[in-house]
Design a protein with these regions (language model features):
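Elongated, mostly alpha-helical coiled-coil "stalk/stator" tethers of large membrane protein machines
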Residues: 1-211, 215-234
Length: 234
C-alpha cells in the first residue's frame, strides 16, 4: 500500500506538492492524507503516511522518495529472506541484458506492464518481498534508471538490517577466505557490518575496486595502468 501511495502521489503533482508544502500546517497535511487514502488503505498505512507528511520536505520528490523508503523498509522487516542479495542479483541480470533494461526503463512503456514483467521474471526465483520491491519501483522511475532504483533499494535494505553495502568489482570471483578477510577489513574501517556484493569485470585485470556509498577504493591493476599512462603523457 505504501508503494501504491507513492505512485499515486507521483502521478498527481498538485496533491504531492500540497503535502510537501511546509507552509501548510502539519495537521492540514495529515487531514489530506486521511481524506485521500483513509477509505481505501489500512489504518497502519494511513498512520505511516500521516507521520511522513507532517515532516519537513524540501520538495514533493523528496516526500515521494521518503514514502518509497518506508515501503522498502516495511517489506524488509516483514521478510526473513535475503532481500538485499536477491535485489543485487536482479540488478546484475538487468545490467547483463540491455533489452530488458531498455524495456523496463522506457518512458513509453506501460507502468503496470513493467511491474508484471518483473514479477514474472522473479516469481519462484526470489522472495515475495523482493518481487514486491522490484516490481513496484520500476512502475515509477521518476527520471531514474532501473539500476539506480535497485541500488538505492539495496542500500535501504542493508541499512534496515544494520549493514552497509560494499560493491566489489574484481576480474574473478573472490574465494570464501578472500571475501571473509575483505569483509572483516572493511567492517573495521567503517565501524559497521558490511555486506559484500561482487561484480565480475575482466577489464579490471587484477586487484579490486570497492565502493561503499560515494566512497571508492580503487586497487585495480587497470586503475594503476591508467595512472601510469597519465603520468607518462604528462
Amino acid at each position: 500500500e505504501l508503494f501504491i501511495a507513492a505512485r499515486e502521489l507521483g502521478q498527481t503533482s498538485q496533491l504531492s506538492g500540497a503535502l510537501a508544502d511546509s507552509a501548510a500546517a502539519p495537521a492540514v497535511r495529515a487531514k489530506v492524507i486521511t481524506d485521500v487514502f483513509g477509505p481505501s488503505m489500512a489504518p497502519a498505512t494511513v498512520g505511516l503516511l500521516t507521520n511522513a507528511v507532517q515532516q519537513r520536505w524540501s520538495s514533493a520528490s523528496d516526500l515521494i522518495d521518503g514514502i518509497e523508503e518506508l515501503a522498502v523498509r516495511a517489506a524488509t522487516i516483514a521478510s526473513d529472506a535475503d532481500v538485499e542479495s536477491e535485489l543485487f542479483e536482479f540488478s546484475r541480470t538487468v545490467a547483463a541484458n540491455p533489452e530488458l533494461e531498455l524495456a523496463l526503463g522506457s518512458r513509453l512503456g506501460d507502468a503496470s506492464a513493467k511491474g508484471d514483467l518483473v514479477a514474472k521474471l522473479l516469481t519462484g526465483r526470489a522472495s515475495e518481498a523482493t518481487v514486491l520491491v522490484a516490481s513496484s519501483l520500476v512502475q515509477q522511475p521518476r527520471e531514474r534508471r532501473v539500476r539506480q532504483l535497485l541500488s538505492r533499494a539495496i542500500r535501504i535494505v542493508a541499512d534496515e538490517r544494520g549493514r552497509a553495502v560494499a560493491t566489489v568489482t574484481a576480474a574473478a570471483a573472490l574465494s570464501a577466505e578472500q571475501a571473509s578477510r575483505l569483509t572483516e577489513l572493511l567492517s573495521r574501517r567503517y565501524g559497521t557490518k558490511i555486506s559484500l556484493n561482487t561484480v565480475i569485470d575482466p577489464t579490471v585485470v587484477g586487484g579490486l575496486r570497492v565502493q561503499i556509498a560515494d566512497d571508492v577504493i580503487d586497487m585495480s591493476v587497470s586503475s594503476r595502468l591508467a595512472d601510469l599512462r597519465q603520468r607518462l603523457a604528462g
